[in-house]
Amino acid sequence: MSRRTIWSMLSLVVVLAMLLVACKPTPTPTPTPPPAAKPTEAPTAVPPTPVPEKKQLEIFSWWTTGGEAAGLLKLFELYNQKFPDVEIINATVAGGAGFEAKPALKARMLGGDPPDSFQVHMGHELIDTWVTTGYMEPLDDLYKQEGWEAVFPKGVLEIVSYDGHYWSVPVNIHRSNVLWYNKKVFEANGWKPPETFDEFFALAEQMKAKGITPLALGDVGIWASTHLFEVILAGTMGPEKYKGLWTGQTDWNGPEVKQALETMAKMLEYVNPDHSALSWDQANDLVIQGKAGMTIMGDWVDADNLAKGFQDSGWAPPGTKGIFIALSDTFGLPKGAPHREQAIEWLRICGSKAGQEAFNPLKGSICARNDCNPELFGPYLKTAMDDWAKDAIVPSLAHGAAASESWVTMINDVMTAFVTDKDVAKAQAGLAQACKDAGVCK
């Protein structure tokens, strides 16, 4: 091979190598990664502002009409003056003597849903229903703090006590045995209020002849008939034998009970025919309007008259002169009260002098305390104060002071039949059996 041929081949190899390099893709430079970002510190968490629990106070009662509602609202007003940040829940259930409220309360208590405090009659209704069954807190410390042992009468202290402890705070004293009448009707006819049962029946005949219903009765729920019966019982047998009915010392099969039933049967001949459809305050309206001459009911009628602007009312003991059939509204502290602290302050208001002086003139009752100013009370309540101090005090049947709630219910059942059939023998047998079933009579 010639030298020229060799150089030609070498030149060709060089050219081909150059072409291969030129055709090779240009490498993309690897980008330099950016510097790692400095981690951002999370801001310090600020805890949410806690929302304070709303302060409430639930009071359960059956005070829905006239003076009783006004008195309750006055107590609420006093409470909110001291504790303006507390919302008061007024849990009322309408129905005189708690006829509708008591079953509603029982359902709540047994279901573990107690109100903060509730209205309950002093005596067996309180003790037998709620204390012995373990649903209430004792209030001994509160009584000592407030000095109540020095201002509540001894008899009242005894009735709110059980097993050496105080269980409720009495806010008032009521009298059940009052005959209320329309003064204008009486004066226009020259009538005088009757003080004995014989005088009552003589006057009732005169009223009937004039076209006036002699006795207004509103016994929807039947308790008002039981109320009427307790007044007749006390007037027939006197204070000691009457009290003996509730201890087993007076025989329910005895002649005095029979006489009382006969008197009541006769009295029922003079009542308004629609009595079973009316409440006690609607019956009182018949007296206010002059359609009826009289009604036998507790002294809450005084508050009803005040609320309705009726000033022509008179009163007399219907065959029970010298006897004071007493009852008291109280408030207690149930175990598990949702707002216990507020409930205790409520009880302080109920037992205070200021609370009782504000409440009772409106309610138509007198103070349970013995240091209230009598000048704050109207004419009737002043006489009630005098009678409370000197009369024989006996407990009310219809309003839970004399008998247990279950016993009262049995007597109400007897009265339900009696106001319809007026069967004295059957009613007396039923009353005697009720005493046995209550465990008091043998």
Map each language-model feature to its residues.
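Extracytoplasmic/periplasmic solute-binding protein
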Residues: 162-171, 177, 201-249, 292
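Glycine-centered hinge/linker elements that transmit conformational signals in sensory
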Residues: 204-206, 246-277
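Extracytoplasmic/periplasmic substrate-binding proteins
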Residues: 62, 75-76, 80, 125, ...
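Long, aromatic- and glycine/proline-rich binding clefts that accommodate carbohydrate-like moieties
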Residues: 157, 311, 360-413, 442
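Conserved N-terminal structural module of periplasmic/extracytoplasmic solute-binding proteins
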Residues: 8, 20-133, 145-150, 193, ...
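Conserved C-terminal helix/tail region of periplasmic/extracytoplasmic solute-binding proteins
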Residues: 38-39, 43-46, 187, 387, ...
